[in-house]
From Swiss-Prot:
Pfam families noted in UniProt: Ribosomal_L4
Example GO biological process: translation
Signal peptide: none
Gene: rplD
Protein known as: Large ribosomal subunit protein uL4
Family membership: Belongs to the universal ribosomal protein uL4 family.
Keywords: Ribonucleoprotein, Ribosomal protein, RNA-binding, rRNA-binding
Example of a GO cellular component annotation carried by this entry: ribonucleoprotein complex
Oligomer and partners: Part of the 50S ribosomal subunit.
Keyword Ion transport: no
Function, as annotated: One of the primary rRNA binding proteins, this protein initially binds near the 5'-end of the 23S rRNA. It is important during the early stages of 50S assembly. It makes multiple contacts with different domains of the 23S rRNA in the assembled 50S subunit and ribosome.
Disulfide bond residue pairs: none
GO molecular function, one term: rRNA binding
Amino acid sequence: MKLDITTLDGGSAGSLELNEAIFGLEPRADILQRMVRYQLAKRRAGTHAVKNRSDVDRTTKKLYKQKGTGNARHGAASAPQFRGGGRAFGPVVRDHSHDLPKKVRALALKHALSSKAKTSTLIVVDDIKVDSHKTKAMIERFEKLGLSSALIIGGSEVDENFGRAARAIPKIDVLPVQGINVYDILRRDTLVLTRAAVDALEERFK
């Protein structure tokens, strides 16, 4: 699969042959869904909790005698049916993460890359080094490339000026190649890879 390489200013910088085993697969929605679910579950803090009837500050004295009143039998004001009582079967602090095989995670990344290539929303740029960290200049560059919602993947390190200029732009995410992930790829309309990122990905899946 051959793809044209562009510059940040919209000029041509040659072409690149992409590996079909990484960028040419038929995307499977089920694999992508499993990976997104895995990522979102893993990032949950799981710190949700409520007070049950042993935690609330209520008297444990019996409200009234057991028999003879005609009312229902009650033993404590901390019961869930009373105002201020404890919550029954409420959420507790727990870990939401679940396992997903390493091979499935790797395959999901290939399918995410392939989905962008198949829908022509994959752009390869030669480099993302810039001289200025001004956001206004970066917005003008992105307008030339037609980018309004994009994930930009640099090499092992992202140019500092580029990162500072892009971080204030809505719907533009910038990551080093080791931070590439399925969820961030799918949540943006366009995926932008540098030549170094493509080389690193092909080396990773060799």
